């Protein structure tokens, strides 16, 4: 009795293994996102061919030859490109060819019918691929990594700094490295700390391929949520003052609102026509202001998300916004070098604080002062009450100051630059407390 059973299993098991089809979402989409989307996505469309959705990937490009034809390898232009021996024909262009294992997946998928196993063939592939673990951060950095995001813990005892595939955590007392939070995208472009819970929101991704917002436990580094998946980077994030809402914006031009603590997606705002570069809340948490590469800033009324006003006073991309802590005014700064204060009531400029900042990068706000960083190597400080420039913070920065964060508990400002330098300033005395290079290899002061 045993031998017939074993014999039948020996015939049946290979058929079971062969019956498992190649999954588009699990097997094919991750390759398209990682290897092809940077040249054939929403931001760059070479050969008039896109792969950022299943529906687009199946269409012909400028060659007018269909990319994938079910059961027909010889008629599938994309398969020809993936396997071509001539480097001029082969894709990915100017890059290593796909691994043989990856090409074999495409071959089987086409032979099996090139089917879609998701629920929406028009959805971005980044929303369909399984949740991924990012590469491990290097033990140390061979060269400095630009500091693109900073945030303090609510008590101001530690500073969280963007890194390469990680977020590094540094002591505010002496600038020593405390810990490293891995499993993060290639770049971190914004950091936001929840006002009460130990949650850190990290926006970023892999440029041109993947965007996402990851929520970590700030103390343990545990990954709690992955939100706002997109086909390009997420650029900004902001918790409301009460912490009950999280606003997220990115290169897809959409502002997404999440209900905390479960981080449920409750609202999408599509009023901008280009990247969302900055987000900030008013003091009561019922209004959200945005900045965009479309040269405008907008104010929305929550919870419905009605647009109240659009400010169009800048000539280039808006890359920093803040709500006045006491008035219904907004501060916005632009790549054109301007820093404007304008009224939400009518969208008219109240005053222009500065128009000679070269390229402005970030804004930070205290109850009495506004701080702006730019392509200069100094931080400019303005009085909120009268809009006058009252001080310039100059220190060891030797390159563009690309990020900043304010610590209201201790009245300190942190700034980070393109060379990986981080400075901590005391605002009362307007003096540098200390500085360090945010490189895990170099924990000593410069």
Predicted regions located by residue number:
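Residue-level detector of Asp-centered blade-edge/turn motifs that repeat once per structural unit
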Residues: 154-155, 195-196, 241-242, 283-284, ...
């Amino acid at each position: 009795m045993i031998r017939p059973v074993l014999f039948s299993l020996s015939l049946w098991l290979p058929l079971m293994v062969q019956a498992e089809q190649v999954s588009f979402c699990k097997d094919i989409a991750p390759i398209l996102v990682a290897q092809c989307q940077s040249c054939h996505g929403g931001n760059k469309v070479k050969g008039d061919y896109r792969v950022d959705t299943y529906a687009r990937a199946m269409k012909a490009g400028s060659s007018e030859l269909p990319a994938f034809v079910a059961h027909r390898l010889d008629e599938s232009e994309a398969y020809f490109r993936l396997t071509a021996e001539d480097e001029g024909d082969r894709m990915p262009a100017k890059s290593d060819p796909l691994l043989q294992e990856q090409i074999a997946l495409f071959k089987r998928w086409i032979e099996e019918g090139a089917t879609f196993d998701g629920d929406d063939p028009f959805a971005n592939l980044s929303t369909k691929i399984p949740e991924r673990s990012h590469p491990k951060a290097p033990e140390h950095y061979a060269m400095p990594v630009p500091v693109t995001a900073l945030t303090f813990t609510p008590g101001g005892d530690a500073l969280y700094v963007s890194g390469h595939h990680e977020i590094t955590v540094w002591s505010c007392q002496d600038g020593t490295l405390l810990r490293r939070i891995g499993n993060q995208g290639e770049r971190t472009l914004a950091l936001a700390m929840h006002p009460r819970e130990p949650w850190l929101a990290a926006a970023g991704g892999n440029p041109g391929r993947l965007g996402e917002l990851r929520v970590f436990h700030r103390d343990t580094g545990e990954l709690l949520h992955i939100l706002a998946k997109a086909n390009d980077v997420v650029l900004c994030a902001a918790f409301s003052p009460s912490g009950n809402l999280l606003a997220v914006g990115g290169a897809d031009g959409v502002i997404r609102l999440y209900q905390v603590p479960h981080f449920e997606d409750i609202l999408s705002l599509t009023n901008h026509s280009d990247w969302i570069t900055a987000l900030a809340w008013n003091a009561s948490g019922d209004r959200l202001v945005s900045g965009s590469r479309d040269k405008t800033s907008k104010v929305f009324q929550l919870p419905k998300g009605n647009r109240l006003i659009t400010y169009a006073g800048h000539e280039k991309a808006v890359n920093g916004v803040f709500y006045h802590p006491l008035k219904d005014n907004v501060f916005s700064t632009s790549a054109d070098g301007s820093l404007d204060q304008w009224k939400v009531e009518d969208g008219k400029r109240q005053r222009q604080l500065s128009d000679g900042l070269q390229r402005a990068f970030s804004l930070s706000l205290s109850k009495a002062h506004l701080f702006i960083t730019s392509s200069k190597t100094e931080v400019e400080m303005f009085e909120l009450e009268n809009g006058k420039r009252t001080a310039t913070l100059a220190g060891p920065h030797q390159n563009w100051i690309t990020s900043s964060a304010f610590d209201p508990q201790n009245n300190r400002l942190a700034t980070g630059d393109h060379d990986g330098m981080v400075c901590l300033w005391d605002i009362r005395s307007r003096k540098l407390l200390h500085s360090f290079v945010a490189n895990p290899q170099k924990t000593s002061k410069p």
